[in-house]
C-alpha cells in the first residue's frame, strides 16, 4: 500500500511539474512537484534522485529569490561536482551516471537562463539515465524517465515552434 502511495505521489509530482510548464511563474509548480518527487525518492532510497530534486529545488529557489545569474549558474555546477565527487570516492562512477549528473546541471542551467537547447540536453540526459536505472532494477526511476522525456519533448516543441 505504501509503495503504491509513493509511486502515485511521484507521478502526481510529475503532473504538477508538467502543468507548471504552462504557467507563469512556473517555479512554484516546479518546487511543489519536486517536493513530491523528493518524497518518492526518499521512500525508495534513490540517492541520485534525492540529489537531483534537492539541486533543482535550490536552483528554483535561487531564481525566485533573484539571487543573480552567476549564482544561478554556479550553484548547480558546484552541487553536481559534489555529487560526482561523492560517487567517484565510493567507486560508483559509470557512464550513465555521469550522463545523469551532467543532465542535472544542464537542466538547472537551462531553467535558470531559459535556454531550451540546454534544457533539452539536460532532460534528455536525465531521461537516458532514468531508463537505464529502471532497466537495472530501480523501477521507480521510470517516473523520472517519463517526466524528463515529456520535458525534452516540450523543449523540442518550444525550439521549433517559437
Kindly give the residue locations of the regions a language model identified.
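Alpha-helical membrane-protein topology signature
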Residues: 1-162
Amino acid at each position: 500500500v505504501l509503495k503504491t502511495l509513493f509511486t502515485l505521489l511521484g507521478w502526481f509530482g510529475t503532473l504538477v511539474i508538467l502543468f507548471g510548464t504552462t504557467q507563469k511563474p512556473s517555479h512554484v509548480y516546479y518546487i511543489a512537484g519536486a517536493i513530491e518527487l523528493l518524497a518518492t525518492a526518499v521512500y525508495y532510497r534513490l540517492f541520485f534522485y534525492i540529489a537531483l530534486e534537492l539541486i533543482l529545488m535550490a536552483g528554483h529557489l535561487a531564481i525566485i529569490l533573484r539571487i543573480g545569474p552567476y549564482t544561478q549558474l554556479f550553484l548547480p555546477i558546484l552541487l553536481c561536482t559534489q555529487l560526482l565527487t561523492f560517487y567517484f570516492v565510493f567507486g560508483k562512477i559509470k557512464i550513465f551516471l555521469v550522463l545523469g549528473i551532467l543532465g542535472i546541471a544542464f537542466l538547472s542551467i537551462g531553467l535558470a537562463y531559459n535556454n531550451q537547447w540546454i534544457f533539452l540536453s539536460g532532460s534528455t540526459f536525465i531521461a537516458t539515465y532514468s531508463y537505464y536505472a529502471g532497466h537495472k532494477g530501480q523501477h521507480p526511476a521510470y517516473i523520472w524517465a517519463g517526466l524528463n522525456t515529456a520535458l525534452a519533448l516540450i523543449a523540442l516543441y518550444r525550439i521549433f515552434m517559437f
